[in-house]
Structure formats: structure tokens, C-alpha cells
Amino acid sequence: MASTTVAQLAAELSRSPAALLEQLQAAGVGKATPDDVITESDKTRLLDYLKRSHGQSDDSARKKITLTKRETSEIRQSDSTGKTRTVQVEVRKKRVLIKRDDVESHGDGADSQESAEAAAEEVRRDEEQRREQAEALARQEAEAQAAREAAEREEAERRAKQEALEAEQRRQAELLAQKAAEEAAAAQAAADAAEETAREKAEEDKARLATERAQAQKNADDAKAAVDKARAEQDSAKAAADKARAEQDAAARRRREAAEAEARAIQQMLNAPPRVLKAPSERKAEEKKAEQTGTLHKPVKPAGATTEAKKDDKKAAPAATTTTAAAGDKKGAKGGKTGTWQDEGSRGKKGGGLKTRGDSSGGVGGWRSGPRGRGGKHNADDARSNFQAPTEPVVREVHVPETVSVADLAHKMAVKASEVIKQMMKLGQMVTINQVLDQETAMIVVEEMGHKAFAAKLDDPEALLVVDGEDHGDAEMLPRPPVVTVMGHVDHGKTSLLDYIRRTKVAAGEAGGITQHIGAYHVETDRGVITFLDTPGHEAFTAMRARGAKATDIVILVVAADDGVMPQTKEAIAHAKAAGVPIVVAITKVDKPEANPDRVKQELVAEQVVPEEYGGESPFVPVSAKTGQGIDDLLENVLLQAEVLELRAPVDAPAKGLVVEAQLDKGKGPIATILVSSGTLKRGDVVLAGSAYGRVRAMLDENGKPSKEAGPSIPVEIQGLSEVPAAGEEVLVLPDERKAREIALFRQGKFRDVKLAKQQAAKLETMLEQMAEGEVQTLPLIVKADVQGSQEALVQSLQKLSTSEVRVQIVHGGVGGISESDVNLATASKAVIIGFNVRADAGARKLAEHNGIDIRYYNIIYDAVDEIKAAMSGMLAPEKRETTIGQVEVRQVFRVPKVGAVAGCMVTDGLIKRNSMVRVLRNNVVIHDGELDSLKRFKDDVKEVKQGFECGLSIKNFNDVQEGDQLEVYEITEVARTL
């Protein structure tokens, strides 16, 4: 055995040698230096000392290890029905191992060593035998347990509810038995250990005193007595568990028999013949007769005892019936089957009704309400309340979403859908159960039906966008270029001014010299970068100008010095003030001889735009786009305003922006011009614009050159969207395409549902308006344009042309070329196709020619408006005008058989024509207005008779012609009307 020093032991224990020496000396081990050798006995003494100092006894010094082993197997067992089922069997084995103390040897004799080994071998054999017996016993008990569990599962399938309680009780019994078995095993192991220790010590210490052997024998006897006691406790626990299981089985059997008896009683009641209802008068007579005569079971009671009997009747009747049922009376079991339903109802609390399981107080309430019931006192009152309808209506709080179907609305109010349909019919609208209602209509219906309506908040995925936007609020804010919008009246020189700044010829490319798109450009000057937005000045582009003002920081208001303030100038001022942006006024065309800048200033002051020289805030700069006069001053004022505004935006953040313009290219697909307002837009980003989403596949600047990224205030053209977005939509960069698709689909569905609901709600109003107005001419149109903004402006301009007689109907409006589907739609709706800066492909042209569809092409918006206006004028009913062409005097009247009155007349003025319209005037009063039937001169039919000649004539459906009457001859001409 290797020797160990104090220093080595201290190193193993991670302690200092000095502290270990102190503990050894306290334990009674004489060690002075770290180099002293320490033996196993010294270690044992030190360990015993430490255990005693920590509060542990010698008995606890022994280490006990409990090993639990589980084995799961399957057995197949046939049940009573012959079916074979598989039962999971789990066998648990538990072993307790105790580490015994090291035996100190007090002698060197070989006899004691051999005897110790022999004794140890004998003890091991005894322990192995006992372990085998314990395993066999555990195996038998596991098999019995598996059989019991199979039987219990079969019982649980029949009566699941009862089995839950039985399983709980059985589990408790098994826990008790298992606990007792564990205690017995622990006691057995402790006894074996004690006996073995005593035997070893007895063999080793033969020289010891007889008193010690007697003490060891006594300890062994005590341990054996403990084992016997544990076994007895185990047997008693097992007997108690068997007894409890038997009692549970008996209780379950009793409950099953009682339930079967109850079911038989219910079946007998259902099979009994129906009883005849009696009138209240007959019932009262019978009750009165019964009170007078009485029976053997219910004798006549004195009047004074009636009230007391009624009070005690509820308690007395159950007791009496229970006694009768216990005696075996069939009437008690069936609950008075000979009585009538009226008797049961009239008796109320007197015990009438079905009686089951020995309960005689069925009453009017439930079958089991009786003396053992928890609510027997209130059963009759509860039963009667079941037949009473609620007196007050239930008012519900209904949360109405933006769109809801009739069926869902009825479900929210807990009424039938037919009730909602009836209410809608009362309100004058015919709906079906699946029809979608808008929020306003649905809330009116809810209020009409007596409930409270609230506008529900949608589970909107767009709410996540706000959170995402806040996450990047800590990005560094850097200066950004100003966004300047050039606004003004048409032909006042906006594009020419911008052209001079950019040194390019933009105006020459616009049709008719007018701007019809928003042009976005950024210009690098010596003083910094400026982004310009050139908006149209034509009146049709109101929405475009509003979008330009929304996205801008500064507005350059262009006013021609020779023209002054015009309608679109006033509109531009209103847009700028609504957006809250500063205005810089550029007075153009000052190089013309007829220019009058002072008049322009006075007119702008009247529009609340006051120049700085008058004490206002708006700088006025006279400029000329031809000579370049004042251009530098204009840029200087713009940059000065930008410095005052301190324009800043985050650069290292997801981009946000605005759709300035959008179009559909046949080869590239949807294209959108975007003005980045904050962040940096990069190629490959996932963008969301309204209901359109996609990944940026390509990005071009305003000159058509590819660009990898765009910072704040930089306009770019992107490709890769799923559809053409609406101009003016906000553009966001999202982290993944799945989220963008989810929000885009939600917006599409929301827009579609709201639009459909509003259309359905307006159908009745539209129908009534058409009935009131009579027949209205309709001009159906299909509008296709190159960009979204032009299509929007053209549609709005055409819809403004509608009148009470002719209405413009926009069947479809879109972006891109004219396709065959557009021609098919025009064929079905009999519409005219208008192409604005687009053309039809070969297939569409051939199909349109075959179907006779008219396709008109325009590149100037007011040309399209003028032609549609002329077409609408042709659809107007012509105006009828009267023209007097002659005067005729009746000189003589002739009566001709089968013809009637024929007037001999003199044409005094003008002429008279056959089939002309005439008015008969007598004493200058019109008495008839009609048409000539015939016109003759000397018995010959003539076409006309001029002034100074005589003629004979007759008037249709008028014979009361007298001498002296005046005939006024006139004709009606149709004159084409204009809008």
C-alpha cells in the first residue's frame, strides 16, 4: 500500500497543509510536519471527526446507494369478448447497497484472516439467495399487477367516469403497498448488514469479552425482530388494499345496478301512454273533491292544519316514499304512475313526478332532486323558471369590422340571419345571407335591432410597420438635398426654366410642349445638390400637383410676367399652403416687352403670397429661361430656404419614399419612379408600395443609367414590382419578402372588400336615381395610358364631362399597351378604347377591326377631352325649335260628307305647306294645335301656297272651323345641342 504524506493529502483536498494539520491534531492524530506519513486509519479517524463535527452519527457514516431498474414488456391477453389486446407491463427492481466500514486488523494471525474470508463468502451467498428470492417475488407481483391493470382498463372502458375514481383509489393503495415494500426491503437490508457486521466482528475479535459477543447477538436479534415486524406490516397493508379494492368493486356494482334501474324507470315512463290534459275548471273540481273525500293514504285534513301540512309536505313525502320503496312497493319505485300530468303540475312541491333510486321528491324539477340533492329546496322554483321567457331584451355590444357578411353579423348579434334580412328589407335593401355589408350599413342595422354597435379594430399586419419604423429611429441624421417642386399655370415656362438649369431639352420631348408627367431630376450645382420635381400645369393634373406638393420641401411658383395669376396658379398656392412648405416665386418671361412684374406681385399679394420687400416671407425672383437672367439668384434663394429648414434624414437605414410615377412596360414589366425620402435604397431590397411588392431587380437614375443605390432626396426608377403601384403610394423597404407579400395581400383584400360593399350599398340609390331621371345616355370608355398619373388625370377629366343626360362610364382604366383582352372587354361592353401615349399590338388591332371596335389614340390630354365632349354632344337629344312660316285667314267653311269641314282660306302672309303644323286662333286665342290633313287649290293637291293666293284645307281631327278664324302655320326644326 503506497504511503501518503500530509502535504500530498492536502493537495488532493485542495487545502493548505497547515489547515489539514490542525484538523488532524483536533481528531487526535499526532502529526507535526507536512512530511509525516498518514495511514488509512488516520484518514478514517479524521473522517469520523469531521462527520461528528458536522452533526452526523456513526450510523450515517455508512453510505447507502439505492439502484432502481425498470423493464418494460408486453403481454397479450384475451378479454371477455374474445378480443386479444396488448398490455404494457413495467417491472421495477430496487437494490440497496451499503458500504461497510473498513475492518481494522488487530493481529497478524492467518487463522483470523481465513475465517474472515470464509464468513464474507457465506454472507455473499446468503445475500445472493435473498436477492434471487426478492426478484422472484417482484416478478410475481409485477405479473399480478399487470393482470390487475388489464382488468382495470376493461372496467374503465365500460364506465369511464367511475373508473377515474377507482383508479385514483387503486393508485393510492399501490403507493401504500409499494412504500411498505420499500420500507421492508430497507429494514431487511439494514438487518442483514447489522447481522453480517456482528458476525464479522465476532469472528475477528474472538479474544474480546463475552459481553461484546452478547451485545452483537442482541443487535442481531433486534434486527431480525424489525424484519419480522416490517413483513407483518407489509402483509397487513396488502390485506387492507385487497379489502379496499373489494369495497370499490362492490360500490361500483351497486352504482351500475342503480343506474340500470334508473334507465329502466325512464324507459317505462317513455313507453307509458300519454295522459289527457284536463281543463283548469275540471282540475279544480277534482282537487276540491279530493280535499273533501280524502283517501286511505291522504285523509281529509282540518282547515287549520292545511298551511302547516303544506310547509311540512316537502319533507314528509320523501321520507314516506323512501320507506315504501324500501319495503318493495312498486308504486314508490315508479313515482305514482296512476296520477295525471295536471296532478303533478298542480301538486307542485308535493312529490309528483318520476321517482328513481328511492327518491320520492321528484317535484316539478329534476328527477334526482330530493332529500339527498344539494338543491332540493329550490327545485320547483327552478323548474317553473324554465318556462318563462326573459322579460327584458338582451342588449349586446357588437364590434363591426369594415366589411361583414349578413350571416356573420347575425352570429355576432346571436339572432337568425333571416331577422337581419328582414331588417334590411325594412330599410329598403334586398340582401342575401352571404352578401357583404360595409361598416356603416352594418352599424345602422345593429342599432335598428336594439344593440350597441362599435367599429372594430382590424388585426392589421400594417401595425407591424410602425414598430419596424421605430426600430431605426436611432440612426444618425445627416443633411440631405432639398426636394423642390416647380408648379404653376400651363405654358408659364416651368419646364423651360428647369431645362435651362439642367442644360437639356426636356420641353421638346413633351407632346404639344406641355408637361404631362411628373419629371424628377436631381441637379448638382456649385452650391449643392437640388432635386427638382416638374409637375404639369394643365387643369386635368390636379392630383399630380397635390402629390408633388406632398413630397416636396420647397415650392417654386412659376408665374409668367405677361400673363399674371391664373386658375392653376391659385391651385398651386393652395397645394403649397396645405403641405406647409415655403414658396419661392419665379416671375418668368421678364424679357418680353409686355412683361409687367409689378402687376404679378399685386395679384399674388391678393392670394396671400407676400414678397419679402413688402414684409412677407416669399422671395420674388424675376427670371428668363431664354437669357438665363435671375437663374443664379433663384438657386441661391432655394438653397437659403433649405438651410433654414435644416433638412436631415438617416442614411444607414432601410429606405422610405414616395411613388412619383408608375407605368407598365411591355418588356420590363411594372416600372415605378420613386423619390427616396430617408434611408438608402439598394438593388436587391424588398420594397412594398401600396398593394404592390417585389424585389428591386434593376435601378436607373433619371438619365437611364444603372445605379446600385440611392440616398435621401434622390429620384430613381425601379423594376421588379408585382404590379403597377398607384402614384402617391408610400414605399417601404422590408426585411423579407414573406412579410411584404402578407401586407400586400391584406391591402388588396381590404380594398376589394370595401369597394364591393360600397358598390352593393349604392346599387339601390343608383337605381332610384335612374328611375327618377328617366333614360340616361351612357358613353362607355376604356382608358389605357402610359403612366399611372396620366391615366388617373384623364379618367378624372372625362368623368367631369358627365351631365344629367349623358354619362361617361369608365369601364376599365389601366397602364400599358392595348391588348386583346381590352378589345374583348370593349366588345362585351360596347365601349370605345382611348389610348393615351400607347398603341395596340397587331393582335388587338386585328380583333378590333373584326369586331368593329373604335380605338382612338391621343398624346395631348385636352385633345382627348375635346373629342369625347364632341361625341357626348352628338348623343344629346336635339333641340326642337319652332319657325312661323305663314298666316292664313278662313273666308268660308264647306261641309263635305265623309270628309268633314273644309276651310276656304286666303294666305295673308308667308306661305303654307302641305303637312305643316297649324294653330287655330279664334279671337287671338289658341283653340287647337295640330297638323294639316290636305291642301288643295282648284281641286288639285299642291305642295305649298304662297301669299296672296286662295286655297282649301282641312285639319286633322278638328272640324270646328269657323269663318274669321286665323291659322298660324309653323314648322319644327331640330338643332344639335352642345355641352
UniProtKB/Swiss-Prot annotation:
Q: What protein name does the entry list?
A: Translation initiation factor IF-2
Q: Is Cell cycle among this UniProt entry's keywords?
A: no
Please state every residue range assigned to the domain named tr-type G.
479-646
For this chain, one GO molecular function annotation is: translation initiation factor activity
List the source organism.
Answer: Cupriavidus metallidurans (strain ATCC 43123 / DSM 2839 / NBRC 102507 / CH34)
Region of interest (G4), ranges: 588-591
Transmembrane regions listed in the UniProt entry: none
The protein's matches in InterPro entries, at most eight in alphabetical order, are given as:
DNA-bd_dom_put_sf, EF-G-like_DII, EFTu-like_2, IF2_assoc_dom_bac, IF2_II, IF2_N, P-loop_NTPase, Small_GTP-bd
Q: Which SUPFAM superfamilies match?
A: Initiation factor IF2/eIF5b, domain 3 (SSF52156), P-loop containing nucleoside triphosphate hydrolases (SSF52540), Putative DNA-binding domain (SSF46955), Translation proteins (SSF50447)
What family does the entry list? Belongs to the TRAFAC class translation factor GTPase superfamily. Classic translation factor GTPase family. IF-2 subfamily.
Region G3, residue ranges: 534-537
Ranges of biased composition (kind: Basic and acidic residues):
50-77, 98-109, 121-142, 149-173, 196-211, 219-263, 280-291
Which residues does the record give as GTP binding sites?
A: 488-495, 534-538, 588-591
Instruction: List compositional bias (Polar residues) regions by residue number.
Output: 78-87
Q: What is its main location?
A: cytoplasm
Q: Which portions of the sequence form the region G5? A: 624-626
Task: Identify the gene encoding this protein.
Answer: infB
Q: Does the keyword Transferase apply?
A: no
Pfam families, A to Z: EF-G_D2, GTP_EFTU, GTP_EFTU_D2, IF-2, IF2_assoc, IF2_N
Q: Where is this region: G1?
A: 488-495
Q: Which intervals of the chain are annotated as region G2?
A: 513-517
Which lineage do the record's taxonomy fields give for this organism?
Bacteria, Pseudomonadati, Pseudomonadota, Betaproteobacteria, Burkholderiales
Query: What keywords were assigned to this record?
Result: Cytoplasm, GTP-binding, Initiation factor, Nucleotide-binding, Protein biosynthesis
Location of the region described as Disordered in the Swiss-Prot/TrEMBL record: 50-385
Function recorded in the entry: One of the essential components for the initiation of protein synthesis. Protects formylmethionyl-tRNA from spontaneous hydrolysis and promotes its binding to the 30S ribosomal subunits. Also involved in the hydrolysis of GTP during the formation of the 70S ribosomal complex.
